[in-house]
Amino acid sequence: MNFATADLCDAHEDQLTAGTLRVLDPVFSRFGRASRFGGEAVTLKVFEDNTLVRATLEEKGVARVLVVDGGGSLRCALVGGNLGKLGEKNGWAGIVVFGCVRDTLELNECNLGIIALATHPQRSQKRGGGERDVSLRLPGSVVRPGEWIYADSDGVLVSSAPLV
């Protein structure tokens, strides 16, 4: 997928004004080999438990983007090297984590895009909690299942419809 988020914003100013194209706040760090990624959003709401993250990444990604609302927790990582490799193997385009990741050397070898608030060496709990396909409130925008995510070095866009 070839795009630049800055160009998408310029080309779709009317959608920015209307609210059908939104920009996440610039609070995320980037990992993984993909300099840009985009696709249809699959949403998860979890808190310090990555059981549902693993279960979702075990599915075929079909170039979709997994968006994980981890409540912004900075106390443990929701995605590490094993899950990054799993996402790559199963064809996910990218992972957005409103929380932490770990194993950054391994994540940076994965051929997908990963963005997260920060890194943390401690793994999450495995309690089996969380919700899938729900609307998420992330910094700067709501993200609904089936919306479109576009991310590059300039930022992350959320669109109600595909832009490229």
Curated annotation (Swiss-Prot):
GO terms for molecular function: 4-hydroxy-4-methyl-2-oxoglutarate aldolase activity; metal ion binding; oxaloacetate decarboxylase activity; ribonuclease inhibitor activity. This is Putative 4-hydroxy-4-methyl-2-oxoglutarate aldolase. Catalyzes the aldol cleavage of 4-hydroxy-4-methyl-2-oxoglutarate (HMG) into 2 molecules of pyruvate. Also contains a secondary oxaloacetate (OAA) decarboxylase activity due to the common pyruvate enolate transition state formed following C-C bond cleavage in the retro-aldol and decarboxylation reactions. One of its GO terms (biological process) is regulation of RNA metabolic process. Keywords: Lyase, Metal-binding. Substrate binds at residues 80-83, 102. Homotrimer. Its EC number is 4.1.3.17, 4.1.1.112. Divalent metal cation. Its cofactor is a divalent metal cation. It comes from Paraburkholderia phymatum (strain DSM 17167 / CIP 108236 / LMG 21445 / STM815) (Burkholderia phymatum). Pfam families: RraA-like. A divalent metal cation binds at residue 103.
